[in-house]
Every structure is written in C-alpha cells, then in structure tokens.
Amino acid sequence: MKKTAILLLVFLCQQANYAQTTKYSTSWFGPNANPVPEFTDARIPSKTTVSLMADYYFGYGDQTKNGYFKIELPLLPERVSLKIWSTVLEHYKTTAEIMQKRGSSSVSGSEGGDIYVQTRIRLLKEQTNLPSIILNSTLKTASAKTFKTRRYFDTPGYYFDLEMGKSIATRGKFISEIRAVANVGFMCWETTNSTQDDAPMYGGKLIIGNPKWKLENTLSGYWGWLHTSTRLNPTADYGDAPLVYATKLTLVMGNIDYFAQYQYGIHDFPYHQLRVGISFPISKLTPKF
C-alpha cells in the first residue's frame, strides 16, 4: 500500500511538472485550438442561416484540413439569435520538429473539434447617424477528446464582444455600399493549474460590394497577459497575442452565398488559411414565436 501511494505521488508530480511546461496559446497548438474569434457585419439575420466550410491550414511545419459547420437561429429576427459552430473532422500532419517542440504525442492523425455556443443581442438598431451595435456572449466547450496531440485545449473558455457597424450608400452600380465594422471585447480561458489567461479582443472590418458580391478585409486579434509574465513565461515565448489578417470574397447567387477566404497569421498564429464555403437560409428551421 505504501509503495503504491509513493508511486502515485511520483506520477502526480510528474504530471504537474509536465503540465506546467504546456503553453495554452495559438503558437503551441493546432490552428483550431483557440483562434482569433471571427465577427460579422454587425447584423442578425431574419432567417436561420447555415454555413458549411472547408479549411486548409499550411506553413510552419503543420498542415491541417478540416470541415467547419455553423448555424445561426434568430429567436427574434434581426434582434436576438443563437449561434452554434464547430470544427468537423480535423486531419493534421506535422513535422517531427513541430511535434517535439509542442510536446505532442503524434505527427499526424484526426481529431474532433470544440463546440462554441453564442447568444447575440442587438443593442442598437442602425440609423442615419448611429451604427448598429450587437452584443455577443460566447462559451467554448472543452469538447475535443485528446489533449496530448496538442490540437485543442483541455479547458473551457468564454468571451464577450461588441460589434459596431455602419454603412454608406454610394449609389454606384459596381460598388453600391461601403460598410465599416469595429469589434471590441474580452476573452478568458483556463490554463495550467487553473490559471486564467485574460485577453482584450479587437478588430476592424471594411466591406465593399453590391447585392451580387462583396469583398471583406479584416484585421483582428487578442492580447493575452501570460506572455508578459516573467514568472510564468521565463522563456518569453508563450505566444498568446495572435494577430491575423483575412480577405474574403462572397458571390451571391439566389439564396446561396458562395465564398472564399485567405487568412494570414501576422503574429503568434503560425498559419496560412484557405477557406471555401457556402451559406444559405432555411425558413423551415426559423423559430416562430
């Protein structure tokens, strides 16, 4: 019995020491672990909207392919909605160097992703001299099954953010609308030994187009505090302040939006992303109260 207790104590100490070397950040995990949150054009749809996407991340010793599913249900059309999304069937392949650097257990494999649940509330309707303002409250579940592969965190997280958007009508045929969107918020996630990493979120988006097409350019990121701590980050490489740039082209054909996106990790997000997808409304799934 005494021998068993000693072995158990040694095992727990080893696990604690091992866990403390894990950096819960975008620099040390797969691209879907804790990405920079996306934000919309500061509008809530009138009908339930489904989006289906395929992503390819590459560069810096990690190649990742995955599906992506998103659904937004307007509980009160254009005022309140519930949104759910998740990565689907992630397949990855890394170099041996990246595997060793992250402390991962495998260079390749497949994973299921985290599930996000978000409520969206319109605080202010867009008017001539006022922007629309949307409040988002988001919960990230720890749905992924395997932590040792360093694809997803084994801890939950949450964030709150405000989207503010305003359009200008140009009366042109090729470009009939210019819309500017700003995003500010606060993100929090749990790390080693219940230590919380807190981060202000920020972003800006410029959208141009007409009813048939639109082009979005987005710069966004968040700024975690753990990389600033000399005690918790003595090697100064925690990497929890990602900044990304994305450009997205959408073509509208009937009720279906077809889109393609390229995203570049400027800081603490060592990936390029290519995304293609479709988005469409489903009237029969729209709640009617």
Predicted region positions:
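Conserved active-site loop/cleft motifs that coordinate metal ions or position small ligands
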Residues: 215-218, 248, 256-263
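Flexible, glycine/proline-enriched loop segments at strand-loop-helix junctions
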Residues: 147-151
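Transmembrane beta-barrel domains of Gram-negative outer membranes and organellar outer membranes
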Residues: 20-141, 155-169, 213-246
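Outer-membrane beta-barrel "beta-signal"
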Residues: 247-254, 271-289
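Detector for outer-membrane/organellar transmembrane beta-barrel domains
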Residues: 153-229
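Bacterial Sec-dependent N-terminal signal peptides
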Residues: 1-23
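Structural signature of outer-membrane beta-barrel domains
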Residues: 57-59, 89-93, 138-144, 185-191, ...
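Residue-level signature of outer-membrane beta-barrel architecture
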Residues: 73-75, 121-123, 166-168, 206-210, ...
